[in-house]
């Protein structure tokens, strides 16, 4: 009887220990998973489109952050101390070095070695200049003209002759930026070279496919013209001979006289696609749309992360 009782007690103790260990396992697993998440290296990018490109090359094992918040105006954005703190904790900071806030951040970071200008090796011929128009002729002065190669970028930091900063819409500059990102990542994480090379090549394949799809769609367009409040697509429309009518002038709302001229120009080019942007006011656009036959107002966010999807959506908007 004593023997039997001893065996039963040992059995209970064994089961009890087993249960306790079993309860700890999920917790331990939880700690392990949390630790893996916490050790993800952080990489910084100036804008959401650049974050998208860095993530494409780096892969999902890296935490890529964009400094400009969603739907914020990247041209008026001012970095805060918290933004700089985030970048101080990041391994690298990828930038186009064209927007005003990018330059401020680069000058403020303690470690300049982490700054990567993704267009440092870009062909200067592919970079477009921003222009401000100061003409005596009122018709030209409002800044809504037909020249496809001369669109205002109206960056508040730009002066005559400076570079149009909306380079993420250039399909020709993307390979240069992607290569620079890949090379800097390889330098920082040489043991991951194969991963970066694979991701880089996959991106180039995807880029080729996107260009092919866009070329086919653009070839079928009957009207290559549109209106936008703040011009930002110069790099893209230049390659496809698309007419643009911009609404703002020198970063300001158009006057009543300028609105009348914009309406006349829209009618002349039979424009029906009018883009509004979450970063800018819509009042002028809505007034103009009421006077333009068959006008359709659609939202277009120039700072949307996925540049490929953004450009494909823009092409679909055109008639």
Annotated model-derived regions:
Residues 2-8:
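Sec-dependent signal peptide recognition
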Residues 17-319:
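Extracytoplasmic metal-acquisition and chelation regions
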């Amino acid at each position: 009887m004593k023997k039997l009782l001893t065996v039963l007690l040992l059995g209970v103790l064994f089961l009890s220990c087993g249960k306790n260990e079993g309860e700890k396992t999920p917790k331990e697993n939880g700690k392990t998973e949390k630790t893996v998440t916490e050790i993800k290296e952080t990489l910084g990018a100036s804008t959401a489109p650049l974050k998208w490109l860095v993530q494409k090359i780096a892969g999902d094992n890296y935490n890529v952050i964009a400094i400009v918040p969603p739907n914020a105006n990247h041209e008026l954005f001012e970095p805060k101390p918290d933004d700089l703190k985030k970048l101080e904790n990041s391994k690298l900071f990828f930038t186009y070095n064209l927007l005003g806030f990018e330059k401020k951040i680069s000058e403020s970071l303690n470690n300049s070695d982490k700054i990567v200008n993704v267009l440092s090796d870009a062909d200067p011929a592919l970079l477009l200049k921003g222009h401000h128009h100061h003409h005596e002729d009122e018709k030209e002065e409002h800044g809504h003209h037909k020249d496809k190669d001369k669109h205002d970028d109206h960056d508040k930091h730009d002066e005559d002759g400076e570079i149009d900063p909306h380079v993420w819409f250039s399909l020709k500059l993307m390979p240069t930026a992607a290569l620079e990102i890949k090379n800097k990542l390889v330098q920082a994480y040489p043991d991951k070279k194969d991963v970066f090379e694979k991701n880089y090549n996959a991106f180039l394949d995807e880029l080729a496919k996107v260009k092919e799809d866009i070329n086919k769609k653009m070839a079928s367009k009957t009207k290559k013209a549109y209106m936008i409040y703040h011009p930002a697509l110069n790099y893209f429309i230049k390659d496809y001979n698309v007419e643009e009518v911009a609404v703002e002038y020198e970063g300001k709302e158009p006057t009543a006289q300028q609105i009348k001229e914009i309406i006349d120009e829209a009618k002349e080019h039979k424009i029906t696609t009018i883009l509004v942007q979450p970063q800018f006011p819509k009042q002028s656009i809505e007034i103009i749309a009421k006077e333009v036959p068959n006008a359709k107002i659609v939202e277009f966010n120039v700072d949307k992360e996925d540049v490929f999807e953004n450009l494909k959506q823009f092409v679909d908007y055109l008639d």
